[in-house]
């Protein structure tokens, strides 16, 4: 197969992994599946801070060709490169299954999954609201890991400027490094399409930014929807609902909210069933007594998991199965 990129303009150059940038005009000449592969691999190189030599070893080609691939002037067998990236991507997915911590499918996960599916399938925005530490972010990242589609996840920087937010989104899309602010908007729009889902987490951080900054960020998010047709999920705490969507910016954001296919508001606490599922995953099978259950009902997901991990450590030291007694001992120790 001839290289479809050799005639594309080469306008970006970089010499190290922390400057990975793609020539989006070149990627436009690829098929959708091929384009997604290259964008994914560029993101892996950037995220892991691999040198070109290291990136080449990962997929089995000479490191000197990595820059040529990303810039669009690789003159070798392009089909061979794409197949190597496919193989590497599959291998990475299998390794993640072996090394990642067990994920517990709670009701939070189910509602997050449904929200993301609706946004992606219908190519529409959705709003996800929930208290801090309930497990939203963990579930969103798990959705990204499991998805067969290209899912991009970005956290809004606290109190950041429009430029900060643009580069955070560009970085999540794998197109942020080595590009100036004037071109980053176009890069973002080129990196997203109807097959992708963009997840914007911590949107409530805009409440810490200047009002006009928040408006400009939301207007750019609307521009992404209009120009790319991607699915979109915006996620945040109650501040998102109370201060952005219903507060002083309500008039600005009304059009955005009207376009949303769904607004999902998560429960403020874990259900007893969810608590039981998480506990069982960490080796505690029996039901808690009344006093322990009262404590459990005050906890959110992140704290529950950390206490169960501490309980497991205590149990291993005693060479015993983990019980609720170990859990309460851990709870007492950290609350002295």
For each predicted feature, which ranges?
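DNA major-groove recognition helix of helix-turn-helix/homeodomain DNA-binding modules
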Residues: 79-96
């Amino acid at each position: 197969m001839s290289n479809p990129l050799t005639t594309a303009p080469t306008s970006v150059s970089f010499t190290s992994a922390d400057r990975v940038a793609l020539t989006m005009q070149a990627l436009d000449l690829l098929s959708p599946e091929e384009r997604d592969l290259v964008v994914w691999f560029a993101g892996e190189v950037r995220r892991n801070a691999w040198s070109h030599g290291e990136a080449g070893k990962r997929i089995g080609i000479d490191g000197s060709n990595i820059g040529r691939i990303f810039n669009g002037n690789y003159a070798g067998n392009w089909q061979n490169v794409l197949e190597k990236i496919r193989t590497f991507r599959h291998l990475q997915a299998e390794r993640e299954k072996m090394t990642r911590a067990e994920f517990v499918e709670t009701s939070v996960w189910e509602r997050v999954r449904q929200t993301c599916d609706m946004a992606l399938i219908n190519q529409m925005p959705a709003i996800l609201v929930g208290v801090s530490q309930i497990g939203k972010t963990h579930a969103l990242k798990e959705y990204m890991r499991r998805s067969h589609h290209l899912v991009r996840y970005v956290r809004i920087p606290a109190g950041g400027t429009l430029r900060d937010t643009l580069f955070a989104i560009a970085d999540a899309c794998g197109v942020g490094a080595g590009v100036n602010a004037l071109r980053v908007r176009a890069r973002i729009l080129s990196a997203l399409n109807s097959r992708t889902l963009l997840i914007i987490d911590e949107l409530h951080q805009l409440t810490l930014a200047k009002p006009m900054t928040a408006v400009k960020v939301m207007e750019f998010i609307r521009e992404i929807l209009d120009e790319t047709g991607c699915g979109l999920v915006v996620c945040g705490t109650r501040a998102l609902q109370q201060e952005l969507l219903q507060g002083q910016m309500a008039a600005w954001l009304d059009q955005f909210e009207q376009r949303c296919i769904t607004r999902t508001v998560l429960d403020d606490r874990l259900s007893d069933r969810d608590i039981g599922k998480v506990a069982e995953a960490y080796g505690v099978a029996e039901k808690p007594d009344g006093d322990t259950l009262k404590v459990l009902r005050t906890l959110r997901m992140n704290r529950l998991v950390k206490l169960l991990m501490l309980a497991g450590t205590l149990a291993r030291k005693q060479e015993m199965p983990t019980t609720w007694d170990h859990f309460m001992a851990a709870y007492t120790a950290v609350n002295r």
